[in-house]
Amino acid sequence: MSTVGREEASPLLPSTAEPSPSRVTLEEGGVGSAGDLDMVPTRRDKLALASILIGLILVLSTSWYLVFSGNLKEMGWFAVHPPMQSLAITAFLLGITPLQPPPPNSTTKKNRFKTHQSVMLGFALPLLAIGSSAMIYNKYIHGAKHFTTWHGKLGLITVIWVILQASIGAASVWGGGKAFGGEEKAKRVYKYHRLSGYLLITLMLFTIHLAGIHSDWANGRGYTNLRILAYYIGLPLIWLGIEIRSR
């Protein structure tokens, strides 16, 4: 993945320092800022963003329809789980997109990074916590075993990973990166935080695929063609868009 490779030249961590004035000569003979080459959204980036949004619409609308077209009373607390988790993944993805591609200057970088933090802490994490808690409580009140399917097991891994991801990300930027021995060391940690984030998104999408296609509940709801559209087409569209926009 190219996420890590170029980070030395243009780290995403907010900094009061301006980008390096170093210049590079382009193959065509022109001269440009080294950091600007990959930071301006291209037509490809915009098409990739459209791919993400189309995929999200398919997944979000299908997940909600499967729940709210059924008997909510019979579903009980389970009815909270799919809507909240689908909103959580939406928030995670929307929290990432302001940083894709990396902003071209320190002011824009800081503003977009604040947006990233606000979406993650204010929406994505709380929604994930609500959706996961509802599922755990639903299992508890029915005396059902936890984490017996691949969806459940990967869901647990995802939640733990999210907690670690958020903790490391916060530690790498708050307080000037003191938790990792200073800003420079924190920047190196942050590179791998970003890489970990892309891998985490992949795991999230696969976990949703297992729920939407292979779970007993989803199969019991029917709507096979709709689920294929959302979870066999929509999810790959999201993943492809995220990967194309990564740097």
What positions do the PLM features span?
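Membrane-embedded alpha-helical bundles that constitute the cytochrome b-like, heme-associated redox core
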Residues: 2-247
